[in-house]
Amino acid sequence: AGGNGGDGGLIGNGGAGGAGGVASSGIGGSGGAGGNAMLFGAGGGVVALTGGAGGAGGAGGNAGLLFGAAGVGGAGGFTNGSALGGAGGAGGAGGLFATGGVGGSGGAGSSGGAGGAGGAGGLFGAGGTGGHGGFADSSFGGVGGAGGAGGLFGAGGEGGSGGHSLVAGGDGGAGGNAGMLALGAAGGAGGIGGDGGTLTAGGIGGAGGAGGNAGLLFGSGGSGGAGGFGFADGGQGGPGGNAGTVFGSGGAGGNGGVGQGFAGGIGGAGGTPGLIGNGGNGGNGGASAVTGGNGGIGGTGVLIGNGGNGGSGGIGAGKAGVGGVSGLLLGLDGFNAPASTSPLHTLQQNVLNVVNEPFQTLTGRPLIGNGANGTPGTGADGGAGGWLFGNGGNGGSGATGTNGGDGGDGGAGGIFFGTGGTGGAGGVGTTGTGGDGGAGGAAFLMGSGGNGGSGGAGLTAGGDGGDGGNAGSFFGAAGTGGAGASTKAGGTGGTGGNGGLFANGGAGGSGGLGGDAGTGGAGGNGGLFGAGGTGGAGGSLGPGAGGAGGNGGLFGAGGTGGSGGHGTPAAVPG
């Protein structure tokens, strides 16, 4: 095993942990832990390691009590043989104001190693992003690491994306929960599921990670991660997290992954809001040439707020998800909500529809209500949420064709509160290139930006992921960039959205698997007090470069760059 790094002094950084030893057979040694900082300084990172079966990466060191960055967890060891990839190390804990460290990426192997968990945030800091799951050549891709929990007043960290595999993609990691007393900070977004399979052998996409929950009283739930693409079945979208009990909107469910041969993935369910807030939109079902996935269920309002839209069904006869019912006092039901048996509720809905009509006609958005979802297969944009409050509608998926059509952009969130709509997935290119995913919709004052849509698969080149939407100016999380499609030439991951005043930038989307693998998307820029987002992982086989970390705000740290993809000496398509 590698030795541990030394602890820093009163003003100084912790030392890096040593690399684990290489084993020609058996298991490689574990990496040493990074040293801890004391008052002013950064925790030590950990050197990557290799081995017969990969050893585990060491844990990142903790940040200084007052200032300094938490250490990044070490990468798990990799192998090009039949052994297992090592697990990534956990990120270090943040100091008083610092974000937790990013978890290490899992090592590549016959089964991919799990990504390391993001470190816990300091008292006012957000949790760290979970590590990317490792690539697998003959079994399951590694599971993405869970996002770190926010400090007492901090936001939850984003879950890591699942590893790609030639058989079955790994599941995305769950987003971390926000701190108990967080004043508007959101739960972390779930990680994107890994892509799975080959054109000749089929394969299954990994499920998206669940969004983290907000704090006890205030804040929005994190969005669920999108399911991965599968050459047979697409992965299921992750459910959105729940909001604080008083104020906040439920997180949006993740889109289901495209299933090229059999079935598209089911969209994730939208999260539950607080007393004041909108239910989360359900994710769109994944497209398929055989059976499209059903859309996710929209979250139900409580007192004041709209029900979430039911997710649109995927191309291939997928059914739309059931929409959420509005709050008891004020709000509009989400798309595809069940007919009410209450005369009072029916009257309330009819009156609101009459009030909304002139606003919709003159401005293109209602006074109160969600924007409409874009029609699947058209690439239509989602509608904007209400002038007072409402979620943006999900973008429609792109059309299947010689070259796939681009997915529609998600609609903007409402002015006072509301979540931006999720971008639509790019369409499949039957003989050419796949379509690009749509961008996530932006929030305005209080709300989270929508996640970008995944790029569409294509015979010659995959589509790029859509960019994540920007967070609300005051509260809410930035959207995650969509994943690039896996094919002969993998697509580039989308750029994460920019944070608001206190929010970190969104994570970049992972690059697609391929002989010429896609580059990970860049992390979004942090707000005034926020850190830059983590760059997306590069696609494997090619391999692809990791995405650049986002720029920190005036008082925030820069984001960690994404891990590069794993190359293989074997012949690859493309």
Tell what function each PLM region has.
Residues A1-G574:
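Long, compositionally biased tandem-repeat segments
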